[in-house]
Amino acid sequence: MIGLNPEMRLISPMLDRAVIDALFPADLPEAAHWERRYPSRQLPGSAQVTRFGPSPTGFVHIGGIYVAMIDRDIATHSRGVYLVRVEDTDTSREVAGALTQFARAFDYFGIRTDESDEHGRYGPYRQSARESIYLTYVRELLRQDKAYLCFATKDELADITARQQAAKIPTGYYGSWAIWRDADPAAVQTKLAEGAPYVVRFRAPDDAAGQRVRFTDVIRGELEHEANRNDTVILKSSDQSPRLPTYHFAHAVDDHLMRVTLVIRGEEWISSVPLHRQLFDALGFKPVTYAHIAPLMKQIPGGKRKLSKRADPEASVDFYIEAGYPSAAILYYLRGLANGRLAELPLSEALSTPIRLDQCGVAGPLVDLVKLDDISADYIATMSGPQILDAVRTWAAQFDPDLATVLDTEPDLALRALAVERDGVDNPRKDLHKWSDFRAAYGFFFPQLFTPLSGSTDERLLPLGVDATITASFAQDFADGYQHLDDPQEWFNQIRELAAKHGFAASVKEYKKNPDAYPGSIREASQLIRIALTGSTRSPDLHAITQTLGSAEVLRRLRTLSTGTA
């Protein structure tokens, strides 16, 4: 086993400063340089500086938008600052295109940062570009003997873990198991001379074992956790370039220098607070305040679980963007999950009312797509026809180019279609939950998108149970005598009179009394016309549809019902 035997550790003096400094670039600034470069922010006393730290290791989780939305809201309403800092220190897991997807997601939801590399004095805002900053503070901890070089190999670390498991004690790199914690400086220099790769580990306080740490969480109140006793890696292996820190160390350095005051993050980080407090203390930084958000959940048989990137399509922000959910509806829904009182307010008021962290629950809220559909439909129902058309065209340009072409060609028809049972009524239609619903709900209005019937035997007619011969005859007579009337009742009387002529019962009640005596009721007769014009048994008012389509198109579709050709 390479290194020092745990039973024969030496209590040794720290490395000579010259040896430590030689590990770093000669022109590496001192900590005072960074403190001057990133001064305290001049903000009102109640202002909060928040940040969101996306990692480009995959798609944006809707939970990320949820947290970023809260970050943005807290900063806005406290007259503070919200910033985005890309946490890309794990270069091995970085996914190509992830940052572009982040930008698209944040732009879609209008969650905009107050600072960036172009207009912010606390950058760079990517951790991979902050290497020299981290190295300065790693060097400072080494100089103060609050960190040390560790040459333990993967095999040695695996052996330590196996022995700990066999002894049924907590696993980790701590105490007598931290074989390089108190290594003789001569042994360290020998390893350095050999060119052996090393990491830098934080030296956990000697009295950490068995201690408890109390801290206040803005959402959860007073919490208590076991103190950290592990000598955590703070700087990755020396054989990597660039030399980047782990999340724990970067969090402490970045949030201090960017003058972040409130860290809002997922509850999975609660157990890391003791370590983070140790790091802030070792570095001489004022600790930040934490608010740990409960994760978004999904209902499953017998309970609920976290919304999963791997198992749940709705976990990805792309799911909502590609489906065409209006961003305002999603934000309204998410704000209601954060603070239940906001779900009771009208949308515009809920979007402008501050989110309160003390009203965020500690149990994860359920993501309910049915509820989101209802909210979205209600929101879209408040929009004007031109607003809806503009939104659908914008969405379709990216996700349904054929539909976009049709809408660009037929904007007037689109507006007339959207006006049906929407304009000038107390309860407008709510058939659009998202922009991708437009083709199914309104596509029949457009000849380019509508598939005419293939005749009286078309499968779309089968649910009505009307004889094909009667169907063809009824449709032919209706087309031959069709009048394009403005009055809805007079127009419908055409169907009523022709239905009677072809033997249809005048009412459903009459038909049910003696079904064998009729091919159907006035309902089936009307549905024959509806299917001929729309391809479906469900549609808006038939007369309104004919007024939108125009006489020529109505007749063309009616003739396909009787003959199969226009």
What do these predicted ranges mean?
Residues 47-51, 83, 313, 349-357, ...:
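Short amphipathic alpha-helical segments and their helix-coil junctions
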Residues 71, 102, 141, 145, ...:
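Residue-level signal for inorganic ion chemistry
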Residues 135-140, 144-146, 198-199, 205, ...:
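Residue patterns forming the tRNA-binding/recognition surfaces of aminoacyl-tRNA synthetases
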Residues 148-292, 297-307, 316, 434, ...:
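Active-site cores that bind ATP or allylic diphosphates and position pyrophosphate for catalysis
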Residues 283-462, 534-566:
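Catalytic adenosine-cofactor/nucleotide-binding cores of aminoacyl-tRNA synthetases and other
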